[in-house]
């Protein structure tokens, strides 16, 4: 059986985009655990973060910043605490202190993801301004560039950017993949 599986770096990148665009406690919790994981290739994570961030529906990834990392105490008490043991936040001095500590650590460790090179900015400008996918300025290996350029979400994004720029304000229709029929 051939089952496609996402690379761990793509999964981490998806969490990094969610961390900034949703500002949810669960994403901050995950990010804090991720920054402690050994053997991650942060260059791959950055490339995948740019790909996923550029694909975001209503967020301009060029404006992403480590300062956007964080969450509200109410999100922890309303959603995250039910997934953790009762006294999880006590060791940190409570949920507010946990947010302060973890936010500072994540902002420091993840800051390089938001420091764009000229090539990375050119990639984002191409996607978001002209509806073009050209990953070559990013300086990533050919296999990574090919994966970025083939990304379905990014292709849908550029289709919408082109339509929007031409005056068509309706979103492009998403096409569904045909179901596979197993023998």
Report the location of each language-model feature.
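Structured mid-to-C-terminal alpha-helical surface segments
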Residues: 1-183
């Amino acid at each position: 059986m051939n089952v496609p599986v996402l690379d761990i770096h793509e999964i981490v990148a998806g969490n990094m985009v969610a961390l900034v665009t949703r500002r949810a406690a669960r994403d901050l919790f995950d990010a804090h655990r991720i920054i402690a994981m050994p053997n991650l290739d942060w260059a791959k994570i950055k490339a995948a973060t740019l790909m996923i961030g550029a694909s975001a529906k209503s967020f301009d990834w060029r404006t992403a910043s480590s300062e956007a990392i964080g969450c509200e105490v109410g999100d922890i008490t309303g959603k995250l605490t039910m997934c953790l043991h009762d006294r999880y936040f006590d060791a940190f001095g409570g949920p507010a202190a946990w947010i302060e500590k973890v936010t500072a650590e994540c902002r420091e460790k993840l800051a390089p993801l938001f420091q764009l090179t000229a090539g990375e900015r050119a990639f984002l400008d191409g996607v978001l301004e002209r509806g073009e996918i050209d990953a070559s300025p990013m300086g990533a290996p050919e296999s990574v560039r090919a994966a970025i350029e083939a990304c379905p979400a990014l292709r849908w994004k550029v289709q919408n950017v082109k339509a929007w720029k031409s005056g068509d304000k309706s979103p492009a229709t998403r096409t569904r993949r045909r179901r596979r029929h197993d023998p």
